[in-house]
Amino acid sequence: MTALEVADWRRQVFAVYSAVRDATDLPAAHDLWRRERDRLFAEHPSTPLLPEDRADFTGLKVRPYDPDWRFEVVVQPVETRRMEVETGTDGIVPFDLIGIVDIPGVGQLDVWRLASYGGGLFIPIKDALAGKPGGTYGGGRYLIDTVKGADLGAGAEPASLVLDFNFAYNPSCAYDPAWACPLAQPGNTVAVEIPVGERYSGSH
């Protein structure tokens, strides 16, 4: 893939999330998100699918929308610390912990800021279904990765975010081991099962 192809992928992802943020019909917005991601995975030169997986690709395994898994949460400040992730393609990528969020029935999640060019917020999630057959990706999923467009916006309260687990998705390394992705650490691992969002079958 070329730099221009990657830029086009990002541009389209940003556009999808912009449409989701503007939507008032959340199930319809979720369906748009699912369909557009299916299209990108199937057709785009920057798809993370391996060549041998593309011919049989019929769509990502995404659960139906459940409004009970949408939250607006206030980011509570904490003492900062740094996490450095070896990505292979981009070298060591630094993240700074900027806060935590408390999610009813789920638990606490760390909120990270990308501490390099572009900045951005990053919230991965690893739940009790991770690594189980028919469950979620063993390394966890992403809720928010704003530098790459995955951003559901701010909540109504100051310093708050919209976290909607229906939009949790697998990182690229779930589909192509050539990618090295930041994965959920202990502060982004919860003991409950999160049945919505994208599932994982080992290929697509």
Regions found by a protein language model. Give the residues of each.
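Ampiphathic alpha-helical segments that act as solvent-exposed interaction surfaces
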Residues: 162, 184-187
